[in-house]
Curated annotation (Swiss-Prot):
Source species of the chain: Sinorhizobium fredii (strain NBRC 101917 / NGR234)
Disordered, as annotated region: 339-362
Annotated protein name in UniProt: Uncharacterized protein y4mM
Description of post-translational modifications: Predicted to be exported by the Tat system. The position of the signal peptide cleavage has not been experimentally proven.
Keyword annotations of the record: Cell membrane, Membrane, Plasmid, Signal, Transmembrane, Transmembrane helix, Transport
Length: 541
Protein backbone atom coordinates (compact mmCIF):
# COMPACT_ATOMS: atom_id res chain seq x y z
CA UNK A 1 0.00 0.00 0.00
CA UNK A 2 1.36 3.43 -0.99
CA UNK A 3 1.76 6.03 1.73
CA UNK A 4 1.14 9.59 0.54
CA UNK A 5 2.97 12.50 2.13
CA UNK A 6 1.62 16.05 2.18
CA UNK A 7 4.33 18.66 1.82
CA UNK A 8 3.97 22.16 3.27
CA UNK A 9 1.81 24.45 1.20
CA UNK A 10 0.83 21.87 -1.26
CA UNK A 11 -1.02 18.97 -2.52
CA UNK A 12 -1.38 15.53 -1.25
CA UNK A 13 0.32 12.83 -3.21
CA UNK A 14 3.63 11.13 -3.81
CA UNK A 15 6.75 13.13 -2.82
CA UNK A 16 8.23 15.13 -5.68
CA UNK A 17 11.82 16.18 -6.15
CA UNK A 18 13.05 18.67 -8.76
CA UNK A 19 16.31 17.77 -10.54
CA UNK A 20 17.52 19.52 -13.72
CA UNK A 21 14.05 20.62 -14.65
CA UNK A 22 12.67 17.12 -14.41
CA UNK A 23 10.28 15.95 -11.75
CA UNK A 24 11.14 12.61 -10.19
CA UNK A 25 8.47 10.88 -8.19
CA UNK A 26 9.22 8.52 -5.34
CA UNK A 27 6.55 6.63 -3.56
CA UNK A 28 7.48 5.59 -0.02
CA UNK A 29 6.19 2.06 0.33
CA UNK A 30 6.68 -0.76 2.74
CA UNK A 31 8.06 -2.74 -0.20
CA UNK A 32 10.80 -0.13 -0.60
CA UNK A 33 11.53 -0.31 3.13
CA UNK A 34 11.91 -4.09 3.00
CA UNK A 35 14.25 -3.71 0.05
CA UNK A 36 16.40 -1.26 1.98
CA UNK A 37 16.40 -3.49 5.06
CA UNK A 38 17.44 -6.45 2.92
CA UNK A 39 20.29 -4.41 1.53
CA UNK A 40 21.46 -3.60 5.05
CA UNK A 41 21.28 -7.20 6.21
CA UNK A 42 22.98 -8.42 3.04
CA UNK A 43 25.96 -6.13 3.51
CA UNK A 44 28.04 -8.68 5.47
CA UNK A 45 27.36 -11.25 2.74
CA UNK A 46 28.58 -8.80 0.09
CA UNK A 47 31.76 -8.24 2.07
CA UNK A 48 32.23 -11.99 2.36
CA UNK A 49 31.85 -12.43 -1.39
CA UNK A 50 34.88 -10.28 -2.11
CA UNK A 51 37.04 -12.40 0.22
CA UNK A 52 38.55 -15.72 -0.81
CA UNK A 53 35.81 -18.33 -0.56
CA UNK A 54 36.30 -20.78 2.28
CA UNK A 55 33.53 -22.96 3.57
CA UNK A 56 33.69 -24.01 7.19
CA UNK A 57 33.12 -23.02 10.78
CA UNK A 58 34.50 -20.02 12.66
CA UNK A 59 34.79 -20.12 16.45
CA UNK A 60 35.77 -17.34 18.84
CA UNK A 61 38.19 -17.96 21.72
CA UNK A 62 38.24 -15.41 24.55
CA UNK A 63 40.70 -15.06 27.43
CA UNK A 64 41.90 -12.39 29.85
CA UNK A 65 45.69 -12.70 29.67
CA UNK A 66 47.99 -9.90 28.54
CA UNK A 67 50.29 -10.13 25.48
CA UNK A 68 53.35 -12.25 26.19
CA UNK A 69 51.57 -14.41 28.75
CA UNK A 70 51.85 -18.20 28.13
CA UNK A 71 48.08 -18.31 27.86
CA UNK A 72 48.17 -15.80 25.01
CA UNK A 73 50.87 -17.73 23.14
CA UNK A 74 49.07 -21.05 23.61
CA UNK A 75 45.75 -19.60 22.42
CA UNK A 76 47.41 -18.46 19.19
CA UNK A 77 49.00 -21.91 18.82
CA UNK A 78 45.62 -23.57 19.33
CA UNK A 79 44.16 -21.51 16.47
CA UNK A 80 47.09 -22.50 14.26
CA UNK A 81 46.77 -26.20 15.13
CA UNK A 82 43.01 -26.24 14.54
CA UNK A 83 43.43 -24.74 11.07
CA UNK A 84 46.14 -27.29 10.31
CA UNK A 85 44.34 -30.37 11.67
CA UNK A 86 41.02 -29.51 9.99
CA UNK A 87 42.56 -28.44 6.67
CA UNK A 88 41.13 -24.96 7.16
CA UNK A 89 37.54 -26.09 7.73
CA UNK A 90 37.56 -24.63 11.26
CA UNK A 91 38.92 -21.16 12.02
CA UNK A 92 39.61 -19.84 15.52
CA UNK A 93 39.45 -16.10 16.14
CA UNK A 94 41.35 -15.25 19.34
CA UNK A 95 40.35 -12.27 21.53
CA UNK A 96 42.61 -11.77 24.55
CA UNK A 97 43.27 -9.20 27.29
CA UNK A 98 39.60 -9.16 28.42
CA UNK A 99 38.44 -7.63 25.14
CA UNK A 100 35.29 -9.78 25.44
CA UNK A 101 34.77 -8.93 29.10
CA UNK A 102 35.80 -10.40 32.43
CA UNK A 103 36.29 -14.13 32.95
CA UNK A 104 32.80 -14.40 34.48
CA UNK A 105 31.26 -12.45 31.62
CA UNK A 106 32.95 -14.76 29.12
CA UNK A 107 31.57 -17.78 30.97
CA UNK A 108 28.08 -16.36 30.68
CA UNK A 109 28.65 -15.78 26.95
CA UNK A 110 29.97 -19.34 26.65
CA UNK A 111 26.83 -20.86 28.16
CA UNK A 112 24.52 -18.81 25.95
CA UNK A 113 26.49 -19.60 22.78
CA UNK A 114 27.69 -16.02 22.25
CA UNK A 115 31.26 -17.27 22.84
CA UNK A 116 32.59 -20.64 21.70
CA UNK A 117 35.82 -21.28 23.62
CA UNK A 118 37.52 -19.68 26.62
CA UNK A 119 40.72 -20.13 28.60
CA UNK A 120 39.23 -19.04 31.90
CA UNK A 121 40.17 -18.59 35.54
CA UNK A 122 39.59 -21.17 38.25
CA UNK A 123 37.89 -18.63 40.51
CA UNK A 124 35.29 -17.71 37.90
CA UNK A 125 34.58 -21.26 36.75
CA UNK A 126 34.10 -22.40 40.34
CA UNK A 127 30.83 -20.48 40.22
CA UNK A 128 29.65 -23.07 37.67
CA UNK A 129 31.29 -26.12 39.23
CA UNK A 130 32.01 -25.41 42.93
CA UNK A 131 34.04 -28.62 43.30
CA UNK A 132 36.72 -27.13 41.05
CA UNK A 133 37.68 -24.69 43.81
CA UNK A 134 39.15 -27.59 45.83
CA UNK A 135 42.15 -27.49 43.50
CA UNK A 136 42.99 -24.14 45.08
CA UNK A 137 43.17 -25.30 48.68
CA UNK A 138 46.23 -23.72 50.33
CA UNK A 139 49.49 -25.63 49.82
CA UNK A 140 47.72 -28.59 48.20
CA UNK A 141 50.10 -28.87 45.23
CA UNK A 142 53.81 -28.07 45.15
CA UNK A 143 53.89 -27.88 41.37
CA UNK A 144 51.82 -28.27 38.21
CA UNK A 145 52.98 -31.83 37.55
CA UNK A 146 51.32 -33.11 40.74
CA UNK A 147 48.13 -31.21 39.97
CA UNK A 148 47.99 -32.70 36.47
CA UNK A 149 48.33 -36.21 37.91
CA UNK A 150 45.18 -35.57 39.94
CA UNK A 151 43.32 -34.04 36.99
CA UNK A 152 44.32 -36.98 34.80
CA UNK A 153 42.56 -39.43 37.14
CA UNK A 154 39.08 -39.95 38.63
CA UNK A 155 38.95 -36.41 40.03
CA UNK A 156 39.41 -34.92 36.57
CA UNK A 157 36.85 -37.30 35.06
CA UNK A 158 34.27 -36.30 37.68
CA UNK A 159 34.95 -32.60 37.06
CA UNK A 160 34.34 -33.13 33.33
CA UNK A 161 30.91 -34.61 34.14
CA UNK A 162 30.08 -31.66 36.38
CA UNK A 163 31.00 -29.18 33.63
CA UNK A 164 29.01 -31.07 30.99
CA UNK A 165 25.96 -30.91 33.27
CA UNK A 166 26.00 -27.10 32.97
CA UNK A 167 26.49 -27.03 29.18
CA UNK A 168 30.27 -26.70 29.05
CA UNK A 169 32.94 -29.10 27.74
CA UNK A 170 36.47 -29.04 29.26
CA UNK A 171 38.94 -29.51 26.39
CA UNK A 172 41.99 -29.42 28.65
CA UNK A 173 43.36 -28.11 31.94
CA UNK A 174 45.81 -25.31 31.33
CA UNK A 175 48.05 -23.93 34.07
CA UNK A 176 47.63 -20.63 35.90
CA UNK A 177 50.70 -21.30 37.99
CA UNK A 178 51.71 -21.29 41.61
CA UNK A 179 50.62 -18.00 43.14
CA UNK A 180 52.81 -15.65 45.18
CA UNK A 181 52.33 -12.49 47.23
CA UNK A 182 53.65 -9.03 46.30
CA UNK A 183 53.31 -5.76 48.22
CA UNK A 184 54.61 -2.21 48.42
CA UNK A 185 54.98 -1.96 52.22
CA UNK A 186 57.58 -4.36 53.55
CA UNK A 187 59.48 -7.61 53.20
CA UNK A 188 57.24 -10.55 54.09
CA UNK A 189 58.82 -13.83 55.19
CA UNK A 190 56.47 -14.96 57.98
CA UNK A 191 52.66 -15.18 58.20
CA UNK A 192 52.40 -12.51 60.90
CA UNK A 193 53.94 -9.95 58.53
CA UNK A 194 50.88 -10.12 56.26
CA UNK A 195 48.56 -9.02 59.06
CA UNK A 196 47.05 -5.56 58.62
CA UNK A 197 47.73 -5.32 54.90
CA UNK A 198 45.05 -4.66 52.32
CA UNK A 199 45.45 -7.33 49.64
CA UNK A 200 43.70 -7.50 46.28
CA UNK A 201 42.33 -10.93 45.45
CA UNK A 202 40.01 -12.19 42.71
CA UNK A 203 36.38 -12.56 43.78
CA UNK A 204 37.26 -16.15 44.68
CA UNK A 205 36.14 -17.25 48.18
CA UNK A 206 39.11 -19.63 48.56
CA UNK A 207 41.72 -16.92 47.96
CA UNK A 208 39.84 -14.41 50.12
CA UNK A 209 39.73 -16.91 52.98
CA UNK A 210 43.46 -17.65 52.71
CA UNK A 211 44.45 -14.02 53.16
CA UNK A 212 41.83 -13.29 55.79
CA UNK A 213 43.24 -16.23 57.75
CA UNK A 214 46.60 -14.43 57.56
CA UNK A 215 45.04 -11.28 59.03
CA UNK A 216 44.80 -9.25 55.83
CA UNK A 217 41.82 -7.28 54.56
CA UNK A 218 40.84 -8.39 51.06
CA UNK A 219 39.57 -6.22 48.24
CA UNK A 220 38.22 -7.39 44.89
CA UNK A 221 39.48 -5.30 41.97
CA UNK A 222 39.33 -6.20 38.28
CA UNK A 223 42.69 -7.44 37.01
CA UNK A 224 42.75 -4.78 34.29
CA UNK A 225 42.51 -2.09 37.00
CA UNK A 226 45.02 -3.68 39.40
CA UNK A 227 48.16 -1.82 38.30
CA UNK A 228 46.54 1.59 38.87
CA UNK A 229 45.03 0.45 42.19
CA UNK A 230 48.48 -0.59 43.43
CA UNK A 231 50.06 2.57 42.07
CA UNK A 232 47.54 4.79 43.85
CA UNK A 233 47.70 2.85 47.12
CA UNK A 234 44.11 1.62 47.00
CA UNK A 235 45.55 -1.75 48.08
CA UNK A 236 48.98 -2.64 49.48
CA UNK A 237 49.53 -5.86 47.61
CA UNK A 238 48.16 -8.67 45.48
CA UNK A 239 48.76 -12.32 44.65
CA UNK A 240 49.34 -13.88 41.22
CA UNK A 241 51.62 -16.29 39.38
CA UNK A 242 55.03 -14.88 38.45
CA UNK A 243 54.11 -14.87 34.74
CA UNK A 244 51.15 -12.55 35.43
CA UNK A 245 53.22 -10.33 37.72
CA UNK A 246 55.74 -9.95 34.91
CA UNK A 247 53.42 -9.55 31.88
CA UNK A 248 51.32 -6.91 33.65
CA UNK A 249 54.43 -5.20 35.13
CA UNK A 250 53.07 -5.34 38.67
CA UNK A 251 56.65 -5.42 39.97
CA UNK A 252 56.91 -1.73 39.03
CA UNK A 253 54.46 -0.82 41.80
CA UNK A 254 55.11 -3.74 44.21
CA UNK A 255 58.84 -4.12 44.90
CA UNK A 256 58.49 -6.82 47.59
CA UNK A 257 57.87 -10.29 46.14
CA UNK A 258 57.34 -13.12 48.62
CA UNK A 259 57.50 -16.66 47.22
CA UNK A 260 54.57 -17.91 49.29
CA UNK A 261 53.40 -20.50 46.75
CA UNK A 262 50.16 -20.48 48.73
CA UNK A 263 48.03 -22.13 46.04
CA UNK A 264 48.05 -23.62 42.56
CA UNK A 265 45.37 -22.75 40.05
CA UNK A 266 44.21 -24.27 36.81
CA UNK A 267 43.09 -22.45 33.70
CA UNK A 268 40.12 -24.51 32.50
CA UNK A 269 40.11 -24.53 28.69
CA UNK A 270 36.41 -24.77 27.91
CA UNK A 271 34.10 -25.07 24.91
CA UNK A 272 30.35 -24.58 24.88
CA UNK A 273 28.23 -27.59 23.97
CA UNK A 274 26.57 -25.35 21.38
CA UNK A 275 29.92 -24.88 19.62
CA UNK A 276 30.74 -28.57 19.99
CA UNK A 277 27.55 -29.49 18.13
CA UNK A 278 28.63 -27.31 15.19
CA UNK A 279 31.94 -29.10 14.68
CA UNK A 280 30.65 -32.48 13.53
CA UNK A 281 33.50 -34.65 12.28
CA UNK A 282 36.10 -31.99 13.13
CA UNK A 283 35.48 -32.26 16.88
CA UNK A 284 38.22 -34.81 17.52
CA UNK A 285 40.74 -32.72 15.60
CA UNK A 286 39.84 -29.68 17.71
CA UNK A 287 40.18 -31.71 20.92
CA UNK A 288 43.60 -32.95 19.80
CA UNK A 289 44.66 -29.38 19.06
CA UNK A 290 43.53 -28.32 22.54
CA UNK A 291 45.63 -31.07 24.18
CA UNK A 292 48.68 -30.13 22.15
CA UNK A 293 48.24 -26.43 22.89
CA UNK A 294 47.77 -27.30 26.57
CA UNK A 295 51.10 -29.12 26.69
CA UNK A 296 52.74 -26.05 25.18
CA UNK A 297 51.00 -23.71 27.62
CA UNK A 298 52.11 -25.70 30.68
CA UNK A 299 55.70 -25.86 29.42
CA UNK A 300 55.72 -22.15 28.63
CA UNK A 301 54.26 -21.41 32.06
CA UNK A 302 56.96 -23.41 33.86
CA UNK A 303 59.71 -21.91 31.70
CA UNK A 304 58.29 -18.42 32.17
CA UNK A 305 58.17 -18.77 35.95
CA UNK A 306 61.83 -19.84 36.07
CA UNK A 307 62.85 -17.09 33.64
CA UNK A 308 60.90 -14.37 35.46
CA UNK A 309 62.16 -15.42 38.89
CA UNK A 310 65.76 -15.30 37.67
CA UNK A 311 65.15 -11.87 36.14
CA UNK A 312 63.54 -10.54 39.33
CA UNK A 313 66.51 -11.71 41.39
CA UNK A 314 68.85 -9.73 39.11
CA UNK A 315 66.92 -6.45 39.50
CA UNK A 316 68.19 -4.52 42.52
CA UNK A 317 64.94 -2.54 42.84
CA UNK A 318 62.99 -5.76 43.49
CA UNK A 319 63.37 -7.72 46.71
CA UNK A 320 62.55 -11.43 46.35
CA UNK A 321 62.01 -13.26 49.65
CA UNK A 322 61.84 -16.97 50.48
CA UNK A 323 59.15 -17.51 53.11
CA UNK A 324 58.43 -19.89 55.96
CA UNK A 325 56.11 -22.11 53.91
CA UNK A 326 55.44 -24.45 56.83
CA UNK A 327 54.39 -21.47 58.93
CA UNK A 328 52.11 -20.20 56.17
CA UNK A 329 50.57 -23.67 55.80
CA UNK A 330 49.79 -23.81 59.52
CA UNK A 331 48.38 -20.28 59.50
CA UNK A 332 45.96 -21.18 56.71
CA UNK A 333 45.02 -24.66 57.97
CA UNK A 334 41.65 -23.30 59.09
CA UNK A 335 40.75 -22.73 55.43
CA UNK A 336 41.17 -26.46 54.77
CA UNK A 337 39.36 -27.48 57.95
CA UNK A 338 36.38 -25.27 57.14
CA UNK A 339 35.86 -27.31 53.99
CA UNK A 340 36.15 -30.74 55.53
CA UNK A 341 33.24 -33.14 56.01
CA UNK A 342 33.17 -36.62 57.57
CA UNK A 343 33.84 -38.04 54.10
CA UNK A 344 36.75 -35.70 53.33
CA UNK A 345 36.98 -32.39 51.48
CA UNK A 346 33.47 -31.26 50.69
CA UNK A 347 32.29 -29.10 47.83
CA UNK A 348 34.58 -26.12 48.37
CA UNK A 349 32.57 -23.14 49.45
CA UNK A 350 33.68 -20.03 51.26
CA UNK A 351 33.87 -20.42 55.03
CA UNK A 352 31.32 -17.63 55.11
CA UNK A 353 28.75 -19.76 53.29
CA UNK A 354 27.99 -22.24 56.07
CA UNK A 355 26.33 -19.25 57.70
CA UNK A 356 23.58 -19.76 55.15
CA UNK A 357 23.63 -23.53 55.43
CA UNK A 358 23.36 -23.46 59.24
CA UNK A 359 20.18 -21.44 59.38
CA UNK A 360 17.89 -22.43 62.17
CA UNK A 361 14.38 -23.63 61.48
CA UNK A 362 12.94 -20.16 62.05
CA UNK A 363 15.39 -18.70 59.51
CA UNK A 364 14.52 -21.13 56.74
CA UNK A 365 11.61 -19.03 55.44
CA UNK A 366 14.03 -16.15 54.80
CA UNK A 367 16.36 -18.50 52.94
CA UNK A 368 13.44 -19.76 50.84
CA UNK A 369 12.34 -16.20 50.11
CA UNK A 370 15.91 -15.25 49.18
CA UNK A 371 16.21 -18.22 46.84
CA UNK A 372 12.87 -17.40 45.22
CA UNK A 373 13.89 -13.76 44.68
CA UNK A 374 17.29 -14.85 43.34
CA UNK A 375 15.67 -17.24 40.84
CA UNK A 376 13.23 -14.50 39.80
CA UNK A 377 16.16 -12.12 39.38
CA UNK A 378 17.99 -14.61 37.16
CA UNK A 379 14.91 -14.96 34.95
CA UNK A 380 14.64 -11.18 34.75
CA UNK A 381 18.32 -10.91 33.84
CA UNK A 382 17.86 -13.44 31.04
CA UNK A 383 14.88 -11.44 29.77
CA UNK A 384 16.81 -8.16 30.03
CA UNK A 385 19.72 -9.64 28.09
CA UNK A 386 17.39 -10.66 25.25
CA UNK A 387 15.80 -7.20 25.29
CA UNK A 388 19.20 -5.51 24.99
CA UNK A 389 20.33 -7.82 22.18
CA UNK A 390 17.19 -7.71 20.04
CA UNK A 391 16.35 -4.05 20.65
CA UNK A 392 19.95 -3.18 19.79
CA UNK A 393 19.70 -5.14 16.54
CA UNK A 394 16.34 -3.55 15.73
CA UNK A 395 17.71 -0.06 16.37
CA UNK A 396 20.64 -0.69 14.07
CA UNK A 397 18.51 -2.18 11.28
CA UNK A 398 15.79 0.49 11.30
CA UNK A 399 18.16 3.42 11.58
CA UNK A 400 20.53 2.08 8.93
CA UNK A 401 17.65 1.26 6.59
CA UNK A 402 16.30 4.77 7.04
CA UNK A 403 19.69 6.26 6.17
CA UNK A 404 19.94 3.97 3.13
CA UNK A 405 16.49 5.03 1.94
CA UNK A 406 17.25 8.70 2.44
CA UNK A 407 20.73 8.91 0.90
CA UNK A 408 21.22 5.79 -1.23
CA UNK A 409 17.74 5.44 -2.70
CA UNK A 410 17.14 9.21 -2.43
CA UNK A 411 13.67 8.46 -1.15
CA UNK A 412 13.44 10.88 1.73
CA UNK A 413 13.48 8.19 4.42
CA UNK A 414 10.71 6.22 6.09
CA UNK A 415 8.45 8.02 8.49
CA UNK A 416 7.57 4.91 10.48
CA UNK A 417 11.25 3.91 10.63
CA UNK A 418 11.93 7.26 12.26
CA UNK A 419 9.28 6.56 14.89
CA UNK A 420 10.37 3.03 15.80
CA UNK A 421 13.78 3.90 17.34
CA UNK A 422 12.05 6.32 19.71
CA UNK A 423 9.79 3.48 20.86
CA UNK A 424 12.55 0.86 21.07
CA UNK A 425 15.32 2.91 22.71
CA UNK A 426 13.75 3.02 26.22
CA UNK A 427 13.64 -0.79 26.30
CA UNK A 428 17.29 -0.95 25.25
CA UNK A 429 18.33 1.44 28.05
CA UNK A 430 16.22 -0.19 30.77
CA UNK A 431 17.50 -3.66 29.84
CA UNK A 432 21.04 -2.43 30.36
CA UNK A 433 20.17 -0.91 33.73
CA UNK A 434 18.68 -4.24 34.88
CA UNK A 435 21.93 -6.05 33.97
CA UNK A 436 24.00 -3.44 35.81
CA UNK A 437 21.84 -3.66 38.93
CA UNK A 438 22.09 -7.47 38.99
CA UNK A 439 25.90 -7.19 38.97
CA UNK A 440 25.85 -4.75 41.90
CA UNK A 441 26.52 -1.89 39.51
CA UNK A 442 24.34 0.78 41.12
CA UNK A 443 25.92 4.18 41.54
CA UNK A 444 27.47 4.15 45.00
CA UNK A 445 29.90 6.09 47.18
CA UNK A 446 32.51 3.34 47.54
CA UNK A 447 34.74 5.31 49.89
CA UNK A 448 32.02 5.12 52.55
CA UNK A 449 32.06 1.33 52.32
CA UNK A 450 35.87 1.37 52.57
CA UNK A 451 35.62 3.15 55.93
CA UNK A 452 33.25 0.53 57.32
CA UNK A 453 34.00 -3.03 58.30
CA UNK A 454 32.21 -6.36 58.51
CA UNK A 455 28.56 -6.07 59.59
CA UNK A 456 28.44 -2.28 59.35
CA UNK A 457 29.55 -2.36 55.73
CA UNK A 458 27.00 -5.03 54.81
CA UNK A 459 24.26 -3.11 56.64
CA UNK A 460 25.11 0.10 54.76
CA UNK A 461 25.11 -1.78 51.45
CA UNK A 462 21.74 -3.43 52.14
CA UNK A 463 20.26 -0.09 53.23
CA UNK A 464 21.52 1.63 50.07
CA UNK A 465 20.03 -1.11 47.90
CA UNK A 466 16.69 -0.92 49.69
CA UNK A 467 16.62 2.84 49.08
CA UNK A 468 17.48 2.26 45.40
CA UNK A 469 14.76 -0.38 45.05
CA UNK A 470 12.21 1.94 46.65
CA UNK A 471 13.23 4.81 44.38
CA UNK A 472 12.86 2.66 41.27
CA UNK A 473 9.44 1.41 42.38
CA UNK A 474 8.32 5.01 42.88
CA UNK A 475 9.75 5.94 39.48
CA UNK A 476 7.91 3.01 37.89
CA UNK A 477 4.61 4.04 39.47
CA UNK A 478 4.98 7.64 38.30
CA UNK A 479 5.91 6.46 34.80
CA UNK A 480 2.78 4.29 34.76
CA UNK A 481 0.59 7.27 35.69
CA UNK A 482 2.17 9.46 33.01
CA UNK A 483 1.87 6.61 30.51
CA UNK A 484 -1.88 6.37 31.04
CA UNK A 485 -2.20 10.06 30.22
CA UNK A 486 0.19 9.92 27.25
CA UNK A 487 -1.69 6.93 25.82
CA UNK A 488 -4.46 9.23 24.67
CA UNK A 489 -2.21 10.43 21.83
CA UNK A 490 -0.84 8.21 19.07
CA UNK A 491 2.13 8.34 16.71
CA UNK A 492 1.17 9.77 13.30
CA UNK A 493 2.39 6.90 11.13
CA UNK A 494 2.21 3.66 13.12
CA UNK A 495 -0.70 4.88 15.27
CA UNK A 496 0.93 3.41 18.38
CA UNK A 497 0.06 5.04 21.72
CA UNK A 498 2.66 7.51 23.01
CA UNK A 499 2.58 5.64 26.31
CA UNK A 500 4.91 2.87 25.02
CA UNK A 501 8.08 4.60 26.22
CA UNK A 502 6.61 5.39 29.63
CA UNK A 503 5.42 1.82 30.13
CA UNK A 504 8.93 0.63 29.19
CA UNK A 505 10.23 2.82 32.01
CA UNK A 506 7.58 1.47 34.40
CA UNK A 507 8.30 -2.19 33.61
CA UNK A 508 12.06 -1.66 33.65
CA UNK A 509 11.92 0.13 37.01
CA UNK A 510 10.05 -2.78 38.60
CA UNK A 511 12.56 -5.28 37.19
CA UNK A 512 15.49 -3.20 38.46
CA UNK A 513 13.86 -3.04 41.90
CA UNK A 514 13.50 -6.85 42.01
CA UNK A 515 17.12 -7.60 41.07
CA UNK A 516 18.28 -4.89 43.50
CA UNK A 517 16.33 -6.59 46.30
CA UNK A 518 17.90 -9.91 45.27
CA UNK A 519 21.39 -8.43 45.70
CA UNK A 520 20.42 -6.94 49.08
CA UNK A 521 19.03 -10.27 50.32
CA UNK A 522 22.14 -12.09 49.10
CA UNK A 523 24.42 -9.78 51.09
CA UNK A 524 22.12 -9.89 54.12
CA UNK A 525 22.20 -13.70 54.11
CA UNK A 526 25.75 -14.47 52.93
CA UNK A 527 27.80 -11.38 53.72
CA UNK A 528 29.70 -8.52 52.06
CA UNK A 529 31.83 -10.68 49.76
CA UNK A 530 28.70 -11.90 47.93
CA UNK A 531 27.48 -8.47 46.82
CA UNK A 532 28.63 -9.23 43.27
CA UNK A 533 27.02 -12.14 41.49
CA UNK A 534 30.00 -14.37 40.63
CA UNK A 535 28.35 -15.67 37.48
CA UNK A 536 27.86 -12.29 35.89
CA UNK A 537 30.09 -9.99 37.89
CA UNK A 538 33.71 -9.00 37.64
CA UNK A 539 35.95 -12.00 38.34
CA UNK A 540 39.43 -11.61 36.94
CA UNK A 541 42.74 -13.43 36.86
Amino acid sequence: MTKTVTRAGGASGPQQFQSGGETMKYEITRRRFLAASSAVLAAPAIVTMVRPARAGTTLTLGHGAAPGNPRTVAAAKFAELVAEKTAGRVTINVAGAETLGSDAAMLTSLRTGALDVTANSQGATSALVPELAALGLPFLFENTAKAMQVLGGPVGAELVKRFEAVGVVPLDWWDNGIRHLTNSKRKVAAPAEVSGMKIRTPADPMTMDIFQALGAATEQIAFGELYVALQQGVVDGQENPLANIDSSKLYEVNKYISLTGHKWESTPFLMSQIAQARLGGDLEAVKAAAKEAGELQRKLSADKDAEVLAAFRRISAIEVTEVDREGFAKATASVVESRRSPSGISSPRSNRQPKAEALSAREHPMKSLSNLVELTARAIVWFARQVVIFSGIALMVFMTANVAARYVLAGGGFSFAQELPVLIFPWFILGGIVLAAHSGGHMAVEWIYDKLRDGARSTAFVAANLVSAGAFLMLGYQAYLVGEIAGIEHSPVLQLPNSVGYFALAVGSVLVAIVTLAVALRVLRLGWDHRTNTESGEVAL
